[in-house]
Amino acid sequence: MINGAFRRRSMAWLAAAALGLGGLGLGDTGTVLGATTPPATLADAWLDLERRQPGAIEWQHAFALRDTTAESVPSLRRRLMGDLHTLAVSARVAGNAPRQRSLEAWRAHLGEWQDRHIRTPQRLDLPWLAANLRHNPPLERIVHFGVCEAPNWVEVWSLDGVTRLDWVPDMSLEHLRDSLSASAARQSDTAAIITPLGEVHRRGIAAWNHQPTSLAPGSRVLLELPSRQGLRGALPFPGVGDEEDLINRRLPELLATRVPGERCRVWGNDEGHNDEGHNDEGHEVKE
């Protein structure tokens, strides 16, 4: 979980960024977003935005979308929806109606997503780029970048469906697990945690592999499908257990591509042009 120390350190990183980027000929972009001298890299664009925006930027809720991610995410989502359909049909044939309903709820939730509300699941904020200048991408390879307001929820994908819990200070996996139905909590041994930074961490949640873990606001948590238990042999379709393993791997990867909040300001790589035209304030997206 990221706290105030991150924000304090970011100010030092910003100063380092200005020096480091300037040393590489990248720090002076003249005028900013929408100006006649466009930023050449993502770090340049962040510096422009940082100078323009009132108040501090919450870098732990900043994001960017590479063109390669924008091309791959729609097909990943379609494949995952197909896998969920296979499992839901198998659960129905096996007479497992609760499991069928849960998987159909997951699939329906994915079907409601808009592919433009995505990010590349890695840190591309200014503090990180300042410390990793060799990984500073050219702006022409960035579809958009932006910052979200810190949300007040944690999203949970479990056999109860897809739910959002109000985030509270010191919220942990234990708190989250206690909020689930007994059957949903009992059937999962492992959870995949997707942080607001787009990182995926796996933690044990059963008695035998329990790992204490705190949750940041805006985290998404998948209680993984129980592929190691008796279900694989009970399902009527050969190879269905493979779909479970794929979902346990692919769904966290897909969740990591979601923007880290609901109220976000997004800027395109055309220096402030967006769907509504030229606007240094960017445009707002909502899930």
Short names for language-model regions:
Residues A12-G25:
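Bacterial N-terminal signal peptides
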Residues I2-R7, G27-D275, D280-E287:
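Ser/Thr/Pro/Gly-biased, low-complexity, turn-/loop-rich segments
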